[in-house]
């Protein structure tokens, strides 16, 4: 049987930890993996050959990841694969440790990295399955947009729901503050993240389901911007 490597990138969150917990549980139950490794500090751990053997972690320990904050597993990074040298190094390390499965948890860059590694492994004849575990607050890692408005692969990315919940609470609190001090601050402007897709902005409406709040949602297109 082949070995498996799990790595994460981007912001460390309980959402990522829970996704990794699910991956560990499924891999152990599959009976198709010999050893299970966690890459210390994301893809950097692969490049530096720092693979932590987590095969013998008990089910009780793994279950704790469901509510573990920050990078409660083996760390994260924001390093982007920059060269063919990096890609070749990753494939070399995987071949050395008989890795047949690679799971990379993160956003757009992580999915791109997993795809590049997968393609290079095929070129070199390495029997390697690469999979991305999506985590992004922007909700933009889901494949092509379908006619019904949903995404082809993953309609609600892990990380998006908790972000919207937090934003809704912030808006409700801001509205209460505005009611108390509108004579000096008649209008409050709240800027949110979301890249080009605008799902976080749209989700702000959940703070006011009955449409009683004077809430105006403005997407980047309204200002002729394309990189917000």
Predicted features by range, described:
Residues 1-7, 92-95, 179:
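Short, hydrophobic/aliphatic alpha-helical segments
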Residues 1-50:
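N-terminal phosphate-binding or glycine-rich loops at protein starts, especially the Walker A/P-loop
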Residues 3-13, 72-77, 100-106, 187-192:
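Short glycine-rich or small-residue beta-strand-to-loop segments that form or flank ligand, phosphate
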Residues 9-11, 39-44, 78-79, 107-108, ...:
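Short, ordered loop/turn segments at secondary-structure junctions
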Residues 13-23, 46-47, 83-87, 108-116, ...:
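Short glycine/serine/threonine-rich phosphate/pyrophosphate-binding segments
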Residues 36, 68-76, 212-218:
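Short beta-strand elements in bilobed, periplasmic/extracellular small-molecule ligand-binding domains
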Residues 39, 93, 101-106, 112-131, ...:
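Accessory alpha-helical/coil subdomains and C-terminal extensions
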Residues 48-100, 109-111, 147-151, 156-173:
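Glycine-rich oxoanion-binding loops at beta->alpha junctions
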